[in-house]
Amino acid sequence: MKTQKVWLITGASRGFGLEIARAALAAGDRVVGTVRSNPEQLTTALQNHPDLHVVQMDVTQEDQVQAAVRQGIARFERVDILVNNAGYGMVTAIEEATDAEVRKQYDTNVFGLLNVTRAVLPYLRQRKSGRVINISSLFGHDVVPGWGLYGSTKFAVEGISKGLAAELTPLGIHVTAVAPGLFTTDFLSTESYVAAKTIIADYQATVGPIRSGADALHGNQPGDPKKFAQVILQLANTERPPLHLLVGKDAIAMCQSNAAKLAQEIEAWLLVATSTDHDQRITASIIA
C-alpha cells in the first residue's frame, strides 16, 4: 500500500506550484499549499480537495513562514517533501536596476527560500527523512542579457542546494535543485515578471530584444507544466534523487553549451591559473 506523503509547496496559487499540488493530490498525497494572497483561489482551483490545506503567507516575512509551517504540521502532523517554488523574474540590464529592486528580488527568490527551509528542516531532521526540492532555473546555470540579476538569484539557489545536500544527506534528507527551461506558465506575463523602471539606451542592442521578446514568447514556450509536475512527482518518489536536475531540452542544451565554454576557458588559461601556489609547500585542501 502506498504511503501517503505530505507536501509543502510555496507559490502554489499558479504555474508550477499549482500543477505540482494538483499532481500530488491526484497521486493520493496531502498538500499544504502556501499563497501570498487570495487563499480561496487555490482552494477553488483544486476543487476543495479534502487533502489540501491552504495557508496564506509571504515568504519574505519569517514570522508568517514559521506560523504557516506550524499550521501545516498541526493539520497533517508532518511534512515529507518541501518544494520551494515561490519566486518571480525581473528583466533588466544589471546597471538599470535600483538597489531596492535588486533587494526585493533577492528577498523573495533567495532569502524567502531560506526562511521556508529553516522553518521546515527541524521537522525533517526529527524524522531523519524527507526531500527538499528547490525550483531553480536554466538561468541558474547560464544567463543571457536582461536576465542576469534574476539568474544570479538562481545561481544562489543552486549553491544553497549543493551546500544543503552536503549537510543533510548524512541525516537522511535529500536535496535537489530543479532547473526548468521555458514552460507555458505565466512567468513571462506582464502580471508576473517585473521590468526595471530605468532604461539605459546603451543597452538597447543587448537587453532591448529580450525585453520586447518576453511578451511574444509568453504562451509559446516549449515546456508543458503538467508534464513538469509529473517529473517532480517522480523525483519525490525516487530512492536516490539527483542533486541537480535540468528539465526541458532548452535547459539541457544551454547547460551543456555553458559547460563546454567553461572547459575551453579552463584549458586555455590552465598554465596561468595553476602558477600561483607557493614553491615547495604542501598545503591542505578543502576538496575531499
Report each predicted region and the residues it spans.
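Conserved glycine-rich cofactor-binding loop
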Residues: 13-15
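Conserved glycine-rich Rossmann-like NAD(P)H-binding loop of the short-chain dehydrogenase/reductase
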Residues: 27-43
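The beta1-alpha1 cofactor-binding region of Rossmann-like NAD(H)/NADP(H)-dependent oxidoreductases
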Residues: 57-67, 99
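Residue(s) in the substrate-gating loop at a strand-loop-helix junction
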Residues: 137
